[in-house]
Amino acid sequence: MIQLRRMEKLTKRELNILEFIKKNKRASNAEIMEYLASISLGSSRITAIRGVNALIKAGLIERKGEGRSVYYEEKSTSLFLSYFDPEEYFKKSPDERNVVFERFNFGIFDNIGEIFSKSELAELKNLNDNYAERIKKLPPSIIKKEFERLTVELSWKSSQIEGNTYSLIDTEILIKENKEAEGHKREEAVMILNHKKALDYILENRKDFKNLNLRKIEDVHGLLVEGLSVAKGLRKKAVGITGTKYRPLDNEYQIKEAMEKMIEFANKKLTDPFSKAIFTTLMISYIQPFEDGNKRTSRLLGNAVLLSGDICPLSYRSINEADYKKAVILFYEQNSARFFKELFIEQFKFVVGNYFL
């Protein structure tokens, strides 16, 4: 089973215990009790132990020592999977948050361990095996229609995340009949149609994305920004991001270096397509290599990686746009992919359960 789903939300007491242990590196029951009493969250041993046990069960801390020498530490995990409660984190404004990384962290490549646990990978692979078995039994005409449906819904949601105001129905009419909706800017239609072009290109060349290179990534980006007055190729000027103090690299040479490191890491260090997909999706957003269209490129590139491994691509249809943006900002500011990973798993479950049936 996958641990710590968002519906299993930590209580205020549990969050405070976790932060106390993180801050102090280790803590005994007595120290935890004293801390809880100091912030008016209970002082009894039972209260402290209940909170500690919940954190152990969630896989966030571990018990060390024996008898009176028992203490607790944050469970050894990479910075890449550090736990943050999104609701609590985003109660503060960008200037109030404790942002660890205001600039690009080249050390991130040293902090990435196993992205998915063995049980998570087993569950994802089992879901995909079910999808693969179903698709074998479907006639080509149905497979074609399902990919068309997924294309419409991915184009709609990915564009919506970027502020596009087309409805799902209007998006379907635009893609299938090439009819633009009234009351919308031409650029919105172009953005949506470009998603279709990019996904068509990926579907036709899916095996080419088993090993990534800069040209393939630039090709996907070029298709997504065609006709939108966006320069193609790596950007040569600084960009800012709304809602965060994080500022991406502003030097073309460092941008290229970061992209090369990302590509090398993805190709040589990540053996399963799920890990490779989530890594590339986040890193393209983090590096912001292009003048515009970075997150669109990241979502399509992640799907290209999945398709190259014969894995069902994501439509993102049911994702909450605010959650998506929060997960990406958490990665910018803390280099933690944990919340984004939860969303990824949820979306994979959704797509396997709703397409190619």
Regions found by a protein language model. Give the residues of each.
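FIC/Doc superfamily catalytic core
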Residues: 1-357
